[in-house]
Regions:
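Short alpha-helical elements of helix-turn-helix
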Residues: 17-24, 68-75, 100
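Basic, amphipathic alpha-helical hairpins
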Residues: 2-8, 22-37, 57, 61, ...
Length: 123
């Protein structure tokens, strides 16, 4: 019996859109449960093996699932900062950050400014 090499799978823009949609649903779930977003829990949410999901996500988006999830959290926070008067602790919770300090740290890494300063600049 000869084993054939597996062809590398090609992912499309539609795959990325589905992943992003699943992340948005998961972040909504995190907000409803007041819990932090975690890769292992995201995999459970999708009923997938975490290692498989991580490998697949890297193939789809080119970065680790953790990094992509964090970027989506920051994008959601940006949207809420610029379109709502919500306080930062609510935005942190809604975007799936476990604590406000984690939110501030990640936001500063992404934008080199605090979320409040970002809101002022975007007014």
């Amino acid at each position: 019996m000869t084993l054939r090499a597996r062809k590398p799978r090609t992912f499309t823009h539609a795959h990325r859109q589905r992943l992003d949609h699943a992340i948005a649903l998961y972040l909504d779930e995190c907000y409803a449960n007041k819990s932090a977003a975690r890769v292992s829990e995201f995999a459970a949410f999708l009923k997938l093996n975490p290692e498989y999901l991580t490998r697949t996500a890297v193939s789809i988006v080119g970065v680790s699932l953790r990094e992509h999830l964090r970027r989506k959290q920051i994008e959601e926070a940006e949207r809420l900062i610029t379109t709502t008067p919500l306080p930062m602790y609510e935005i942190a919770l809604h975007a799936g950050f476990g604590t406000t300090s984690t939110f501030y740290r990640c936001f500063r890494q992404a934008h080199s400014m605090a979320p409040g300063a970002f809101r002022e600049v975007r007014k």
